[in-house]
A protein has these predicted regions:
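Active-site beta-alpha connecting loops in nucleotide-dependent enzymes
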Residues: 58-63, 67, 309, 327-405
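Acidic, Mg2+-coordinating active-site environments of NTP-dependent enzymes
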Residues: 52, 86-92, 201-322, 344-351, ...
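Phosphate-binding loop of NTP-binding sites
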Residues: 106-237, 241, 247-253, 289, ...
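Short SAM/SAH-binding signature in class I
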Residues: 175, 199, 284, 425-433
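N-terminal leader/targeting and accessory segments in enzymes
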Residues: 2, 9-110, 114, 376-394
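Short acidic-hydrophobic, aromatic-tinged amphipathic segments that line or gate anion-handling sites
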Residues: 99-103, 407-416
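A glycine-rich beta-strand to alpha-helix segment
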Residues: 127, 420-439
């Protein structure tokens, strides 16, 4: 579903008039920003309220934050920004701390943009089908060798997370790095209008969120919205010279300044990332570091000091097996890259390879074909045992005329886990690849 755009001009907040509890006074965004400066911590989850914060009552498909505004104030929030105009009357005991606006989400987004403008610092936006978070982590560590850097925490990369990222930046920050995720056209454009980046990286264009983007060409258009923004605003992009798709996209925008770099920049830079495809992420970090004046020795140190977590490109040796975990997210492009890398991975004392592959989501009409393609790639790995998890892989497998040997289907992660506890494996090199959203 497309995200709502920001309003034209500055939003107005409705502040309850403390002199007369039945009337409201209009307060421009500047007044709300002054209140934010006095209470710079932002909360959106009433279950985890930071003391003296401002709570934004956001709405979702199955929740309404307005219902929890009074609870947030009880738990220590200084104020609550709400978009239910009846709240001051239904909770008069909290009325002096309720800020009524006509859209809490848009107010949050506009407040974040106001703060970004007040800070006036350079911001690098990172998007792409794969590798966003890894690239963000590498780049932030490299730039932190010279600057005070604030980068997106966790997965706060959407229409709520990006404003929260910006509002977490303090005046001592010298460089901001904002990860931008999207599953439909228009979403990157919205995030750019909030964060107003000066620099950008599109890591790659892959087959991710095909359903929301409407197909591969939609992915290209959607991710290209970062290039569009930077072309209009005089920004600069960092483009891997050996990626013909990204080079073509940059060339199509005549006013776009581009810093092109070869992936050979990653040569000789030691790191703890699994997979040859991570050379692109390392090269991007080196290119950005050099552009902003970080010396090569500090770049190598920063990249080498990064150890992935959250099951992203991790190799873990247990007492019985060696695990390659890449199961934060999965789409056809990242799945294919993992399989190509796993095929080349040496056994290093293990006796066989096992693939545990989980369903790829949000593929729409492309789901069956993409799952069949991944099964065929897995079958090309010699003597590998294939464990497929989820209904999409099961449907694709059953539709194959020629099915790979030594393949087992599991309806869920729980069933697979129970089977492995009952019949544990040992001396195996195991690739675990799938989306965290399927468990």
């Amino acid at each position: 579903m497309p995200l709502a755009g920001l309003p034209i001009g500055k939003r107005s907040a409705l502040l309850l008039d403390k002199e007369n509890m039945t009337k409201y006074s209009i307060s421009p965004m500047s007044s709300l920003y002054e209140l934010y400066l006095r209470h710079p911590r932002i909360s959106t989850d009433s279950r985890r309220i930071e003391p003296d914060s401002v709570f934004f009552a956001l709405r979702g498909a199955s929740f309404d934050g307005n219902r929890f505004a009074a609870d947030a104030l009880e738990k220590g929030a200084a104020y609550a920004v709400v978009d239910d105009p009846s709240l001051p009357n239904t909770r008069p005991d909290k009325a002096d701390r309720l800020i009524v606006v006509d859209d809490a989400l848009q107010t949050l987004q506009t407040l974040a943009r106001e703060h970004r403008r007040e800070l006036g610092l350079p911001i690098l936006a990172i998007t792409g089908s794969n590798g966003k978070t890894t690239t963000k982590e590498l780049v932030s560590r490299v730039l932190a060798e010279k600057y005070e850097v604030y980068a997106t925490r966790g997965n706060l990369n959407n229409h709520i997370g990006v404003p929260l990222t910006l509002l977490a930046m303090t005046r001592d920050v010298e460089f901001g790095i904002v990860e931008m995720g999207a599953s439909a056209c228009g979403e990157i454009a919205l995030l750019c209008s909030i964060a107003e980046p000066n620099y950008g990286i599109v890591t790659n264009i892959g087959r991710a969120h095909l359903e929301g983007f409407g197909g591969p060409e939609g992915v290209r258009r959607g991710k290209g919205e970062l290039y569009d923004w930077l072309a209009r605003t005089g920004g600069r992009v960092f483009v891997p010279a050996n990626d013909p798709v990204l080079m073509s996209m940059a060339a199509e925008r005549e006013t776009l300044a581009a810093e092109c770099y070869p992936t050979t920049l990653a040569d000789g830079v030691e790191h703890h990332l699994e997979g040859d495809y991570n050379r692109f992420n390392v090269a991007a970090a080196v290119a950005v570091g050099r552009y902003f004046g970080v010396d090569d020795e500090r770049i190598r140190y920063a990249v080498g000091s990064y150890r992935p977590d959250n099951h992203r490109s991790q190799k873990i040796r247990t007492g019985q097996n060696t695990l390659i975990l890449d199961c934060y997210n999965a789409n056809p492009s990242s799945m294919q890259a993992s399989l190509v890398n796993f095929r080349q991975e040496p056994l290093e004392g293990c006796t066989r390879k096992i693939l545990i592959l989980g369903d790829m989501l949000e593929l729409g009409d492309w789901s069956d074909a993409e799952h069949r393609h991944i099964i065929s790639l897995a079958a090309e790995i010699p003597d590998a045992r294939i464990l497929l998890v989820g209904p999409h892989f099961a449907k694709a497998y059953r539709s194959l005329e020629s099915r790979p040997a030594d393949t087992t289907l599991y309806p869920s992660q729980e069933v697979l886990a129970a089977e492995l506890r009952k019949h544990p494996v040992s001396q195996a090199l195991i690739l675990v690849k799938g989306s965290h959203s399927i468990g």
